[in-house]
Curated annotation (Swiss-Prot):
The chain crosses the membrane at residues 64-84, 92-112, 179-199, 203-223, 239-259. It is found in: Endoplasmic reticulum membrane; Endoplasmic reticulum-Golgi intermediate compartment membrane; Golgi apparatus membrane. Signal peptide: none annotated. GO terms for cellular component: endoplasmic reticulum; endoplasmic reticulum membrane; endoplasmic reticulum-Golgi intermediate compartment; endoplasmic reticulum-Golgi intermediate compartment membrane; Golgi membrane. InterPro entries: Surf1/Surf4 (IPR045214), Surf4 (IPR002995). This is Surfeit locus protein 4. It is a multi-pass membrane protein.
């Protein structure tokens, strides 16, 4: 089987997968995407005093402000998740979750930790795609009304979302000389570039979903660590943040790359 035949078979499989799952894939994508906010909101509830004391100690802001911060995080994240899953006021929910990301980036000093900053930006990319999807749903209500060609901010949201999502994979690159690490870096980088430029996008994004899910289950198996150990919370945080990026990639699979992409430009050539 030649290279073109192999690529064609893979694309046929991706198209078949999309046809079979198109009814529920967006719902799974949204659930995966908001999973890190859902988990963090629930954790805020059960670790209220620990989170409050951490903020108070770090910023020396006092009991009241620290408690207000934890409450805002808890309420903002759980409310945003409920709105996204119920498909109500999704755009407002996305803006609220963007605010939570920005707030946590500052409060937990993530701004100075490149790895966690890139993961937060990737999470923001997933929210951009969710925002683009909500705009698309709104426009579908007026399907019979003539509109301008897809020159709205939606296509640029999709582009920005794709570019930000690939930052997640940059945090997974290994800089040792083992064969597996080199192979993983080459394949991962190639797929990242394809998703970013929007070429063979659905196939590349679906491949990244499978690869990232396997890595996530293997390296972030928090359920194998006793709850009382700090590593349990650390791995759980990584696991659900990775699941959110997987949700963003599933939205790319479900919605396509948008107007600013190689796949779209090929149709005009």
């Amino acid at each position: 089987m030649g290279q073109n035949d192999l690529m064609g078979t893979a694309e046929d499989f991706a198209d078949q997968f999309l046809r079979v799952t198109k009814q529920y894939l967006p719902h799974v994508a949204r659930l995966c995407l908001i999973s890190t906010f859902l988990e963090d909101g629930i954790r805020m509830w059960f670790q209220w005093s620990e989170q409050r004391d951490y903020i108070d100690t770090t910023w020396n802001c006092g009991y009241l402000l620290a408690s207000s911060f934890v409450f805002l995080n808890l309420l903002g994240q759980l409310t945003g998740c409920i709105l996204v899953l119920s498909r109500n006021f999704v755009q407002y929910a996305c803006f609220g979750l963007f605010g939570i990301i920005a707030l946590q980036t500052i409060a937990y000093s993530i701004l100075w930790d490149l790895k966690f900053l890139m993961r937060n930006l990737a999470l923001g990319g997933g929210l951009l795609l969710l925002l683009a999807e909500s705009r698309s749903e709104g426009k579908s209500m007026f399907a019979g009304v003539p509109t301008m060609r897809e020159s709205s901010p939606k296509q640029y949201m999709q582009l920005g979302g794709r570019v930000l999502l690939v930052l997640m994979f940059m945090t997974l690159l290994h800089f040792d000389a083992s064969f597996f690490s080199i192979l993983q870096n080459i394949v991962g980088t190639a797929l990242m570039i394809l998703v970013a430029i929007g070429f063979k996008t659905k196939l590349a994004a679906l491949t990244l979903v499978v690869w990232l899910f396997a890595i996530n289950v293997y390296f972030n198996a928090f359920w194998t660590i006793p709850v009382y150990k700090p590593m349990h919370d650390f791995l759980k945080y990584d696991f659900f943040q990775t699941m959110s990026v997987i949700g963003g990639l599933l939205l790319v699979v479900a919605l396509g790359p948008g107007g600013v992409s190689m796949d779209e430009k090929k149709k005009e050539w």
